[in-house]
A protein has these predicted regions:
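Amphipathic alpha-helical interaction motifs in eukaryotic regulatory proteins
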Residues: 11-12, 28-36, 71, 75, ...
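Von Willebrand factor
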Residues: 1-111, 116-119, ...
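P/S/T/G-enriched low-complexity
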Residues: 8, 134-135, 146, 150, ...
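Charged, surface-exposed interaction regions in soluble eukaryotic proteins
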Residues: 112-146
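Beta-strand elements of modular eukaryotic interaction domains
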Residues: 15-17, 35-40, 48, 79, ...
């Protein structure tokens, strides 16, 4: 059982046509595939969607088993500004913290269609490892812990 938040890059970089038809559409197709696979794998799996660009990252859909809600929210996304991965991960962690089923494993999937600065990657890793250490069961060493996030797609 998993609760997954998919972080979508809706920055200006995703207008690029180097992936047919655009980087953004390639992400939308990947979200469709990922959300479908997650919800079919286990009926208790949930998927949520968060945008990373604009004024602030925004949760479009909280984790839900309803594939239709996930797919519908993709049509309303506005491409604007620059992606803020660090803030997006923090907001995704909050959304996962308040999930309905606390027995679900937490997973954050990040689609990056824009360049990611080296220092931002370090900040994001630090945030994910810090939250992993806070939520680790007693007796678990830090070497046994896995960070909550991983980059699934980088189109830059």
């Amino acid at each position: 059982m998993e609760a997954t938040i998919v972080c979508i890059d809706n920055s200006e970089w995703t207008r690029s046509g180097d992936y047919a038809p655009t980087r953004f559409q390639a992400q939308a197709d990947a979200v469709n595939l990922l959300a479908g696979a997650k919800t079919q794998a286990n009926p208790e799996n949930t998927v949520g969607v968060l945008t990373m660009a604009g004024k602030n990252p925004r949760v479009l859909v909280t984790p839900t088993p309803d594939l239709g809600k996930v797919l519908n929210c993709m049509t309303d996304i506005v491409i604007e500004g620059e992606a803020n991965i660090t803030s997006a991960v923090q907001i995704a962690q909050l959304a996962l913290k308040h999930r309905q089923n606390k027995n679900q494993r937490q997973r954050i999937v990040i689609f990056a269609g824009s360049p990611v600065q080296e220092d931002k990657v370090g900040d994001t890793k630090r945030i994910s490892m810090h939250s992993s250490q806070q939520s680790a069961p007693r007796g678990m060493r830090s070497s046994q812990q896995r960070p909550l996030w991983y980059t699934c797609c980088s189109c830059s």
